[in-house]
Amino acid sequence: MKGIILHGGHGTRLRPLTHTGPKQLLPIANKPMSQFCLEAIFETGITEIAIIIGGVGSNKVREYYGDGNKFGVKITYIEQDEPRGIAHAIRLCKDFINNDKFLVFLGDNIIQKSITDFVKKFKNSDYDATVLLCEVDNPSRFGIADIENEKILKITEKPKNPTSNLAVTGIYLLTPLIFEIIDNLKPSWRNELEITDALDDLLRQNNNISFERITDYWKDTGTPEDIIHANGEIIKKMLENLENDHIIGKDTVIESNVKINGPVVIGDNCHISSGSSIGPNVSVGNNTTVAISNIENSIVMENCKINSSAEIKNSIIANNSDIKDDEGAKKIFLLGEGSKVSL
């Protein structure tokens, strides 16, 4: 089997964070979110992976992952010149896939459960596709599967009046038959080739699609709130088998009279000054300094300088940002790379 990671799109709901790079490189617990996808694929034994790139900062994806050697995989990069839908991106991989079964993983999806058993089951089955489903509270945001007697009846993309709460997650197990379906697919109202439409057409053609339920944590990180929530959940997972409620990187200095309220992860070569409070649910990237600041439920990326008497909550602060704030009130920041704030 082979793997595909979708790494394109404009990430408009995450601006200004995505003005300088793709959303899939935004960090969750100090690691690019798409790296969680790559590691999940590698865990299944798949080592040939195509990464679909396009849009702002595609070069950053190549720079970070390289040829894949340091991750134990072989990476092929495939360009999608414009965002024309998930099905279109998959179709671009036809030559790469050849006649193999394959796994597709959207690079902005975070899942805690191993997918190894799902992959093994599909590999040994005669199904043309397997979709992973998860119950959600807001089904109109997702492609939705209607199930009856443990069979998929239909799949609908972002229905206005959903008749099910089972979202089709961004993880698909497919065979090359899907390429024929996509070749005959008509664009949606968004002028995109929708993977949900392709799966629904495949379902009507031969009714040979299975599904698996995800009961552990899954998040489609489409908004800042989604990313912050995923950050907290992943840090909790990282700390499950550790005695401490936090992780501190090498050469990081934590002065006396600093409160760390886990779950928290702090990167390498950071400096947290006396009087600061970090956490809960906070990640701090490498080479960041925090002086007399209170940070909660937030992501602070690399090379930042935070000197704020305010309570910083529910915030995402991108690389190389500088905050100076003497006002002392509660603040929520959503800062793109290289931001300078003085209040």
What is each model feature region?
Residues K2-I5, R13, P27, K31-F105, ...:
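Conserved N-terminal catalytic core of the sugar/cofactor nucleotidyltransferase
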Residues G9, D108, E135, T223:
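Active-site glycine-centered loops adjacent to acidic/histidine catalytic or metal-binding residues
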Residues E48-G54, L132-L133, I299, I316:
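Short internal beta-strands
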Residues I110, V119, K123, I152-L239:
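Catalytic-core segments of class I nucleotidyltransferases/pyrophosphorylases
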Residues K113-S140:
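Conserved donor-nucleotide/metal-binding helix-loop-beta segment in metal-dependent transferases, i.e.
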Residues D146-K151:
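Short acidic-glycine loop/turn motifs at beta-strand connectors
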Residues T223-D245, K250-D251, S256-N257, G275:
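Internal anion-binding site segments
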